[in-house]
């Protein structure tokens, strides 16, 4: 008789994804982050669910309901800070996962890559709306500033902003709808992640060399299940260390002040994982131009497969492109730092140069490096 895990309709799906999946024998730890993202998502949904049981999406009580969770609910403080810092860990994993895809040329799996870009955008939207919910100063002003950017859209901009706000300013209607969206989106992310995985399993995983690995595949279990468990242990260690020793390390002190529409905080800035995009937005003096640059800074990922000029898939054997890749990482770190600084000299010019370099590296320098490397190989 066939093993139940291979014959049962539901077990078969899990078996083909986690047990008998043929995986390349040489994938490194950079391939761990997909499973870590899955763990992050489950963790965020669970902690979020328990938070939603005690949270009230109302301008008068939202702030105090979060305080109540931290003070009066059993282990509420742990759930709240695991959820807040879980988002940071989620984005660290996301950025590494995308970076891995860029470095090793995984973007040639078009469907998988494009769904990944949609997943990134959806996760960013979810995180933004979640940041508004505690209804502190940075929540309120962050929501005001970011939603206001839509008013730069010609003709329909102002109507669009008022439609999203549900009034003429960020108020009760805005908070209620943001809570509704923040609750539903993670489940949409889960469905998209399943499709992401479905398309990946159509082609099989890429590997560090970028060379087809059909000649040398190994079963996912036990080799990569045990490797993933190690990754999860390290991830949980990081998350718990952050939550228990420095829960407010990545947060903004302004968010411990209840939202006040009459007093603007000195420096409005988003959470650290949006700072790179925020720096690009601020580096352009024109409102519409800034919004376009902000959107393009993420959507440019969808163009990457079209900008691939090299005859090799991975950067493993391409030192010139490797240098440019690490320059891009350094540039993104610079943008992240600039996004958290006030708008004054010398930060303005540094931000503008870093923004230009970001687009220049992706759109011009890396494709040109690919062509040069092709020539060098022929020569």
UniProtKB/Swiss-Prot annotation:
Keywords carried by this UniProt record: Electron transport, Heme, Iron, Membrane, Metal-binding, Mitochondrion, Mitochondrion inner membrane, Respiratory chain, Transmembrane, Transmembrane helix, Transport, Ubiquinone
Note: Heme 1 (or BL or b562) is low-potential and absorbs at about 562 nm, and heme 2 (or BH or b566) is high-potential and absorbs at about 566 nm.
Main location: mitochondrion
Single GO biological process annotation from the record: mitochondrial electron transport, ubiquinol to cytochrome c
Residues that span the membrane, as ranges: 33-53, 77-98, 113-133, 178-198, 226-246, 288-308, 320-340, 347-367
Alphabetized GO MF terms: metal ion binding; ubiquinol-cytochrome-c reductase activity
Chain sites annotated for binding heme b b566: 97, 196
The name this protein goes by in its record: Cytochrome b
Cofactor binding remark: Binds 2 heme b groups non-covalently.
Record's subunit section: The cytochrome bc1 complex contains 11 subunits: 3 respiratory subunits (MT-CYB, CYC1 and UQCRFS1), 2 core proteins (UQCRC1 and UQCRC2) and 6 low-molecular weight proteins (UQCRH/QCR6, UQCRB/QCR7, UQCRQ/QCR8, UQCR10/QCR9, UQCR11/QCR10 and a cleavage product of UQCRFS1). This cytochrome bc1 complex then forms a dimer.
Residue numbers binding heme b b562: 83, 182
Subcellular compartments: Mitochondrion inner membrane
Binding site residues for a ubiquinone: 201
Cofactor(s) this protein cannot do without: heme b
Protein family: Belongs to the cytochrome b family.
Topology term for the membrane: Multi-pass membrane protein
Domain of life the protein comes from: Eukaryota
Function: Component of the ubiquinol-cytochrome c reductase complex (complex III or cytochrome b-c1 complex) that is part of the mitochondrial respiratory chain. The b-c1 complex mediates electron transfer from ubiquinol to cytochrome c. Contributes to the generation of a proton gradient across the mitochondrial membrane that is then used for ATP synthesis.
CDD domains: cytochrome_b_C, Cytochrome_b_N
Taxonomy of the source species: Eukaryota, Metazoa, Chordata, Craniata, Vertebrata
Pfam families the UniProt entry points to: Cytochrom_B_C (PF00032), Cytochrome_B (PF00033)
């Amino acid at each position: 008789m066939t093993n139940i895990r291979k014959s049962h309709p539901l077990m078969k799906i899990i078996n083909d994804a986690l047990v008998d999946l043929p995986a390349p024998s040489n994938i490194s730890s950079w391939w761990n982050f997909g499973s870590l993202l899955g763990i992050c998502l489950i963790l965020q949904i669970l902690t979020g669910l328990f938070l939603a049981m005690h949270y009230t999406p109302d301008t008068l009580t939202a702030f105090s309901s979060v305080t109540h969770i931290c003070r009066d609910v059993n282990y509420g403080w742990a759930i709240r800070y695991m959820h807040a810092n879980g988002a940071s860990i989620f984005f660290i994993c996301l950025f590494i996962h995308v970076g891995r895809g860029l470095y090793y040329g995984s973007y040639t799996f078009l469907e998988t890559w494009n769904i990944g870009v949609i997943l990134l955008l959806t996760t960013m939207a979810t995180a933004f709306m979640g940041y508004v919910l505690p209804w502190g100063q940075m929540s309120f002003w962050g929501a005001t500033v970011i939603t206001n950017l839509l008013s730069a859209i010609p003709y329909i901009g102002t109507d669009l902003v008022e439609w999203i706000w549900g009034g003429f300013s960020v108020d009760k209607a805005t908070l209620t709808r943001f809570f509704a969206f923040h609750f539903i989106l993670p489940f949409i992310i889960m469905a998209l992640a399943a499709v992401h995985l479905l398309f990946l399993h159509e082609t099989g995983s890429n590997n560090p060399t970028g060379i087809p690995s059909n000649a040398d595949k190994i079963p996912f279990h036990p080799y990569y299940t045990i490797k993933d468990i190690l990754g999860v242990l390290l991830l949980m260690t990081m998350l718990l260390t952050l939550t228990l020793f420095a829960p407010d390390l990545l947060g903004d002190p302004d968010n411990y002040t209840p939202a006040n529409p009459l007093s603007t905080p000195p420096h409005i800035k988003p959470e650290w994982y949006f700072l790179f995009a925020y720096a690009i937005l601020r580096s352009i003096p024109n409102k519409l131009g800034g919004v376009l640059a902000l959107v393009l800074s993420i959507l440019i990922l969808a163009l990457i497969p079209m900008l691939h000029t090299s005859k090799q898939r991975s950067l493993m054997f391409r030192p010139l492109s490797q240098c440019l890749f690490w320059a891009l990482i350094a540039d993104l770190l610079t943008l992240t730092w600039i996004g958290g600084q006030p708008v004054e000299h010398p930060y303005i010019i540094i931000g503008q140069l870093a923004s230009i370099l970001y687009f220049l590296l992706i759109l011009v320098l890396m494709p040109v490096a690919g062509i040069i490397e092709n020539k060098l190989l022929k020569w």
